[in-house]
Amino acid sequence: MIEGKTFNLTLATSSRKFLEGTTNTYGYNKLSFWGPTLILNQGETVTMNVKNELKEATTVHWHGLHLPAATDGGPHQIVEPGKTWSPSFVVKNNAGTYWYHPHLHEATQKQLALGAGGLIIIRDPIEAKLALPRTYGVDDLPLVLTSRRFKENQITYDGDNDKYGDYQLTNGTLDAQTKLPRQLVRLRILNAEIERGYVLGFSDNRVFYQIATDGGLVDKPVPLKRLTLMVGERTEILVDLGADKVGGTVDLMAYNSNQTFGFPGGEPDTGGANGSFLNNYDYRLLHINVVAPTAKAVTKVPETLTRNVFVSEKEATAKRTISVTDGRPHFAFDGKPFDMHTTNMVVKLGATEVWTVKNNNIFGHSFHLHDVQFRILSRTDREIADYEKGWKDTFYLPKGASVTFVAKFDDFASDTDPFMFHCHMSNHEDGGMMGQFIVSKDPAAVKKDAKGMINFRAQTKHPLPAAEVVATAAQASKPAAVFAKSDLSGNRLVLADLAKTKPVVLFFIEKECPCSRDAAPYLSQLQAAYGRSCSVVGVINADEVGAKEWAAAVKPGFPVIPDPDFAVIDAYGAKRSVYVTVIAPGGTIAKAYPGYNADSLSEISATVAQLGGVPSVKLVWKDAPGELLAGCPLK
């Protein structure tokens, strides 16, 4: 636990023992799984110094906090290896339980699975006046619920294949147990799963009392015997152990049996991509041993907690609908996989809006909105549960259902820094089930392109997985895959002819990716410099119409061949745009590059000159990146 106004968080590799042997993990501040709980006070200005000691990029998102988009820690606020990110912000949220976790696009599941994350507790004057348990770790206990799958003692995180763990981890511990005093105790519970949902209850079916949702206290304690908690959601409950005997025990349970298909973790399989030994099964989350009460025990559940003033639907000036679509191979919103570079949703600063999220798919999702807390207005699958009538930032969206909520977008505006909305199942968000929006003082003044999109290309970087770097390096000396395709002018391009006496440079293009547009001028520069001594050929993941649209916008100085069936792309192992393959005369791959920067462009130039038997041309790569940049996924 860390308190204060300045918080230093260092993310690094670590290890611990879960089963037999040592398991590699990630942790903050030398912890081996999860990070320290941060205690913040409403109204104070805090500084977060996030140092990245991994060998890969990361981000840290302050989940549930209301703060400027530039300090939100989403996919755009990347912390490179060895660097420190130090955002400062005023704590505006109500007292409650929030959390922090990585949000690096396409790498969230990996980093979260390995243990990167932690809790945030915010205190405020209203909560401080209440007679509630708040001695951290004694009668006020945080619980982070998740599960993991292991192979040869190592945590696995391969997308859908590892979305459900076989081993329950509570606070990073197998078969967790604790001692709690014989009195009223407070449990702050976070579902930090990859995908699994939990139906919470106690082994003796006792009543417990919910006192807070995602965004803080509810008006009055809500008596419950069961509570469904989806990925990213938090709840605070009071459990009365006053009638228990010292030495007695009770278990916090996941009552997940008899779920229908579509409930995350409701699949009946015990193995495979959708299977787990914990699926559709009731099991223990925490074994509680009752011990003697503390000297200042809280023994009575308060009758009232606060008086929330919710935003009224009548104040709404706009209504929006978002639909969950696809699922083959990845889920998306409105049929559009996430593009970090653009958004087409602009919200006016201070506006109250009503959003409806429709799930037209066969599977349930966990919807999370950055920036603000909201109030759920309606559901089509059932009545709004008592336990979700408070402030929310995350909710369960079952298959075939719609959820409508109202939110006010106040305080923070930026025409260049977006907020996110996404499925909080990290395998889904990594697969592209995300969108983003801008809060603007003057939406009409925000510049859009011909398609009505707002461009964030300058802020975008993609993680380059180590496996792709290794696979790319392995391409060298392999025979180049043959192809014969027509370019946009109708010319037939046959590799055997192109590479008969001179080198060929293949440049792989994602049709909507600004990375491709940014890199194309450098390849045009290369072609112009060496003229007939080499052939630069663009390969784009589009049909002829899409390829011509791209070429009209970019005006490349080299021919482009459409590859809508990915035949050439797959044959060369290209996973992302701006992938470059250099082919020697005769048809052997000289080298492949998973991304580009000034150094790689200079190396390609020198290689082309050497292979072509011509003098090397000294080129100036104006504004080329200094670090190796990969592009958007080609699929």
Give each language-model segment a name.
Residues V90-G96, D240-V246, K408-T416:
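Short, surface-exposed loop/turn segments at beta-strand-coil junctions that are enriched for proline
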Residues L464-A496:
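N-terminal "domain-start" segment that seeds a small globular fold
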Residues S312, A318-I376, D393-P418, H422:
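C-terminal substrate/ligand-recognition segments
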Residues A552-P556, F566-T607:
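Thiol/disulfide oxidoreductase modules built on the thioredoxin-like
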Residues P585-K635:
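Thiol-/selenol-based redox modules, centered on thioredoxin-like
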Residues M1-D240, N258-T260, T270-N308, E315-T325, ...:
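Histidine-centered copper-binding motifs that mark active-site loops
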Residues L495-R517:
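Short active-site neighborhood of thiol/selenol oxidoreductases, capturing the structured segment around
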Residues R517-V554, D565-D570:
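Structural microenvironment flanking redox-active thiols in thiol-disulfide oxidoreductases
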